[in-house]
Amino acid sequence: MPYFSDKMTFFFCQDEIGKSFATIEEIKIWEENEIMNIWIIFIGFMILSWIVSMTLKSKFNKYSKIPLDNGMSGREVAEKMLRDMGITGVKIGSVEGQLTDHYNPADKTINLSREVYEGRSISSAAVAAHETGHAVQHAKAYAWLGFRSALVPAVSFTSKWVQWILLAGILLVRTFPALLLAGIVLFALTTLFSFITLPVEIDASRRALAWLSNAGITSYQNQQMAQDALKWAAYTYVITALGSLAALLYYIMIFTGSRR
């Protein structure tokens, strides 16, 4: 009886070990498939981002050739919107480059690209009003803008190092997994920043379009064009946020896979 008992135990152990190896192989195959899926999604977002970026430039170039009915420049549009909103202490300046327009809450300046600053087109009016919309958000203590502004110093520092930390973390994931985990935490911060940016940009466009219409800056046809231009600008932020999320999931997959 002991002989048969030992033999049964031996075969049972063999069976369990076989099942364990099968399970490990299944996990590896699943991980490889998931990582491949994440890569496909990531590459898809890169292609989509390029398409949206090219479309955005095409839209702005198209609408930059259509003059605003009242002939106002981007600077004049921004100045009038600030006056109408009762906002003071905000400076309007010109910066070099295309689509480099932005509002800086740190020094309360609306920075418009030269084309927008001097331009008297639909594009110039839409962009100038959008950036002024950020100044309105700041003046009215819009919560999401406050959250984003609070994250700017940390994200600015993180963005300089996160890719190097992630690269080193992936190379050393088996021996020093904590490095990759640190990179994931830092990258998660930039992903969070991308998603917080969405409501900020969408709200600024909403304020801009409402004011352009209510103030009589744009006719009905002009308004549709301005809305189209700002819609495509918003798409770039959506794609950026989703692409960042896909990359974050990819890094998490690598980390969790190394722990098995």
What are these regions (language model features)?
Residues 35-59, 169, 176, 182:
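Hydrophobic alpha-helical transmembrane segments of small proteolipidic membrane proteins, enriched
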Residues 44, 53-159, 192-260:
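Polar-ligand-bearing catalytic/cofactor-coordination segments
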Residues 168-185, 254-260:
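Membrane-interfacial helix-loop-helix connectors in multipass membrane proteins
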Residues 152-176:
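Post-HExxH zinc-binding segment in Zn-dependent metallohydrolases
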